[in-house]
Design a protein with these regions (language model features):
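Bacterial Sec-dependent N-terminal signal peptides
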Residues: 2-5, 10-38
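First exposed extracellular module after export/assembly in secreted or surface-exposed proteins
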Residues: 28-131
Length: 131
């Protein structure tokens, strides 16, 4: 009888532990997309040297408040350099970045990263090929 009670108690404890799930933060990052429409560059493109472009991003909060937007550029596959680092807030942010392509042939990767209060980061990039 004692073995049966021990077995039954052990089974009940395991069932209770298996039934309890720890709630976890889904860590949903902010949403960000490139602005489309007349006058905006919203995807990879081939451009002439020293061309002036406008890249726009639309950012929406998911769970946590937005805190920062970083714009960086990487030339010819090298490491990136920060062009602009902005403090942002609110549930919806739209940002336009005027870009002047280099006067020499090569590639430019423009990288936009948004961070929320929990440290969730969303990154979008596009590549300009200067010819």
């Amino acid at each position: 009888m004692r073995i049966a009670n021990t077995f039954l108690t052990g089974t009940l404890v395991l069932a209770l532990l298996a039934g309890c799930k720890k709630e976890t933060d889904p860590r949903v990052p902010p949403s960000m997309s490139f602005r489309t429409g007349s006058g905006y560059t919203s995807g990879n493109d081939t451009v002439p040297p020293a061309d002036t472009l406008l890249i726009g991003v639309v950012i929406d909060k998911t769970e946590d408040p937005l805190i920062a937007l970083n714009v960086s550029v990487a030339y010819d596959g090298a490491g990136s350099s920060t062009v602009e680092n902005l403090s942002i807030s609110g549930e919806h942010v739209e940002h336009d970045q005027q870009v002047i392509a280099r006067a020499q042939a090569g590639s430019e990767e423009w990288i936009f990263s948004v961070t929320d209060r929990d440290g969730n980061i969303t990154t979008r990039s596009l590549t300009l090929t200067v010819q």
